[in-house]
């Protein structure tokens, strides 16, 4: 009985852990990725050298075997190669355009931003009939904040009257300049 339970536990752990240990062949995956990267880089460099002639390299002098050293003869007929040079040029051009357009978008792409934009639009559509004026009782001279809304002429008159009264009655003391600062 003990042997059966140990065997079942061993088979269960082997079935559970066996999926991770029997992974795909990593050197072949590396070769495929390397070939794909080398081909795309070679196409870009080839296109750049043909569009900007520098005299250092020519299209005919660059062999394709130096670009991908792990390339087998059986992998050369795969879909990684472009059928003609114009398709490679289009792919390079699209790649460069996508790199330049990455910083163009300033908006937010999260769902919360969409919700905030929608709420703002609803607020704008429903509040068009409201006016931006303060209520009448707040605008009156007895309303809130009237001291801060006094006209400049009233402020200057009140300060000149107060300062002339102070100069005629008493000499300025040590606290006179502080009291002037706190007056409005």
Curated annotation (Swiss-Prot):
The record marks 114, 123 as: Required for CALCRL receptor interaction. GO terms for biological process: adenylate cyclase-activating G protein-coupled receptor signaling pathway; adrenomedullin receptor signaling pathway; branching involved in labyrinthine layer morphogenesis; cell population proliferation; developmental growth; G protein-coupled receptor internalization; heart development; negative regulation of vascular permeability. One of its GO terms (molecular function) is adrenomedullin receptor binding. It is found in: Secreted. Keywords: Amidation, Cleavage on pair of basic residues, Disulfide bond, Hormone, Secreted, Signal. One of its GO terms (cellular component) is cytoplasm. The modification Tyrosine amide is found at residue 144. It holds the Pfam family Calc_CGRP_IAPP. The modification Arginine amide is found at residue 41. Disulfide bonds join 108-113. Residues 1-21 form the signal peptide. Residues 130-149 are annotated as: Disordered. Residues 45-92, 151-184 form a propeptide. InterPro entries: Adrenomedullin-reg_peptide, Calcitonin/adrenomedullin, Pro-ADM. Numerous actions have been reported most related to the physiologic control of fluid and electrolyte homeostasis. PANTHER family: ADRENOMEDULLIN, ADM (PTHR23414), PRO-ADRENOMEDULLIN (PTHR23414:SF3). Belongs to the adrenomedullin family. This is Pro-adrenomedullin.
């Amino acid at each position: 009985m003990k042997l059966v339970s140990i065997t079942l536990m061993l088979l269960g752990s082997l079935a559970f852990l066996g999926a991770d240990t029997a992974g795909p062949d990593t050197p072949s995956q590396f070769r495929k990725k390397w070939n794909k990267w080398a081909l795309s880089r070679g196409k870009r460099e080839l296109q750049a050298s043909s569009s900007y002639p520098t005299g250092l390299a020519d299209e005919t002098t660059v062999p394709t075997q130096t670009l991908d050293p792990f390339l087998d003869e059986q992998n050369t007929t795969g879909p990684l190669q472009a059928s003609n040079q114009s398709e490679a040029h289009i792919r390079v051009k699209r790649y460069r355009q996508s790199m330049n357009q990455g910083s163009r978008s300033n908006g937010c792409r999260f769902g919360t931003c969409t919700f905030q934009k929608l709420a703002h639009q609803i607020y704008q559509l429903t509040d068009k009939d409201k006016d931006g004026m303060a209520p009448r009782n707040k605008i009156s001279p007895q309303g809130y904040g009237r001291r801060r809304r006094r006209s400049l002429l009233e402020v200057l008159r009140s300060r000149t009257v107060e300062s002339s009264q102070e100069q005629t009655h008493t000499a300025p003391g040590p606290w006179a300049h502080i009291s002037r600062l706190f007056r409005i």
